[in-house]
Amino acid sequence: ILHKNVNIGFNGNLNLGLAYERNPKFNSSIDMNYRSGKLNFYGSYGNNLNENANFGNIFRPDENSEQIFNFFDDSKSHLIKAGIDFYLNDNNTLSFFTNQNIFDGATEGNTDIIYNNATTFNNQQTFLSDNENDSQQYNFNYKLDFNEDSSHNIELEVDHNIYEGDANTLNRFFGATTRPNFFELTNTERDRTTINLDYVNPLSDSVKLELGLQARLFENIIDYESNARSQNSMGTYIPTTTNFDYSRNIYSAYATYGKKLEKWSYQVGLRAETVKVETLARETDLQTNAVTEIPFDNDYVQVYPSAFFTYNPSEKNTYQLSYSRRIDRPGVGQVNPLPEWNTPLISSFGNQELQPQFTNSVEVNYTRNLEKGSVTAGVFYRLVEDEISRAVFVDRSNLNRIILTYDNFDNTSAYGIEFSSNYRPTTWWSINGSFDLYSQTQTSISERLTVPTDVATINDIVIESVDVDNVAWNFRMFNNFKVSKSLSFSAFGFYRGQNRNIQFEMKPMYFVNVGMRYSFLDSKATFSFNYNDIFNTMRFGFDGDRPFAQTGEFNWESNTWFLGLSYRFGSGKYRAKSRKRRDKDEKEGSGGVF
């Protein structure tokens, strides 16, 4: 057995990839690892050169009008990573790495508004946005092992992230519109520090105790300026600046206790946290120097219990019962009240007062081990408190426009069944599949107009409580066909059934991907080919009647082929010291229209 202080080795990996449908997408990377005695050095470089087209339309039957969207993104990013692991002795390890990411992107957009019954009202918006940002990550880790197999240990990890970005956007308008052209300048500075202390102690062969402390400190400052984005009380477009300061500090502690009996095992846990959120949006009218401040604070203390029970009456049968409560906090993009994007008929903003959502889950599962695989069946119930979701409201300054934002819905409940399986019918064919069917009930506040938009007033906006009952299902299957030791083929299929929420009814989404892999040069090199969405069916379609009737569809470059080549070199098998995986517990924005 080689001890840590005598291990020597060098290895690396080179990757090249090219994807294409309408536009090329290229990526490459190289990573290397060198181990000499107590020191392990590693580094990598990767780049992505992407061009993407997105397009869609929204039709409004009440006025027989259509919005036609065309967007084009061109981005370049470079990621550099370097790190070192220092094995002081068999029990103590120090580790440090840094990531440096440089991004440069541009987006061009065009929105046409077409009124089929009154073409003289047709108008158009174009925009050009440039975005540059740099992000840095610095990570330190110290681990102390109390025994030879490292099962009893204490570990300290400190992670610090810095983000700085600048964006400038030019919006231009043509046709039947009185809206002036305007620019937008945005500067973003973000700092995130996370400190974790984890302790693991196997008290015996059948008992395990884990304890931990965590601090997460986050601050985000955005400075925004525009010469004609906002309107004053008289309806005049005015130059403004807005500063949005968002800070969130989280301090938490957790404990889990697990024990194995003859045929039973269980693990119970509890995490407690205290959270302090402070936000301030400060808008200045550059014509009058009038200042409007909107503060919002949210302090709370929460606990998150969990329990997992497993019963193994035999090698072929396993029963599981679990309960958990978790949190999904709003992402910074969801709480940012500054404009995300806009068209002549849509404006998208975050919601500064967005609350976190909490999910309580109960699951019961049964697993049957077969001669050629396994099958798992289960039932579940989930209750989501203050669910975060997209919301659509009527723009009070122009009742023909909508405001797209995020809101907390009332409690959402769902129950259903799940099936999953991995099975090998033959020595050359393996299958992994899953299916879930669930019933969901949502309750929230929504808005709608009771008369056509051309004659509507603010008094025609109805605010009402809406209940939506929905049954939905999802299916996915992955097949792998091994022709020889070096050649294999794959096929993946996905289907998401029709789905309904407070605002929209989403149409089914489905696609099929195929691929192949071929290894050569003594399995050191691998060539891969993937063809995604081979029938070109993947798209997002919806119908809605709040605040007024509309139907739409959005598409992207999903029907792509991909060529990849990778090559492993060197004789060593050493890798950088891994980090513990942690739950981000933050809900991401949609990143698009709906």
Could you say what each language-model-derived stretch is?
Residues 409-413, 430-508, 513:
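C-terminal extracellular loops and terminal segments
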Residues 24-28, 74-78, 132-136, 189-193, ...:
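Residues that define the transmembrane beta-barrel architecture of outer-membrane proteins
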Residues 15-17, 65-70, 121-128, 178-185, ...:
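Extracellular loop and loop/strand-boundary signature of outer-membrane beta-barrel proteins
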Residues 192-196, 238-242, 349-351, 355, ...:
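Outer membrane beta-barrel strand-and-loop segments of large Gram-negative receptors
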Residues 209-314, 447, 451:
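Signature of Gram-negative outer-membrane beta-barrel scaffolds
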Residues 1-110, 127-164, 198-218, 256-258, ...:
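Membrane-proximal, glycine/serine-rich, low-complexity loop/turn segments characteristic
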Residues 54-64, 107-121, 166-175, 222-230, ...:
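Outer-membrane beta-barrel translocator domains and adjoining extracellular loop/strand segments
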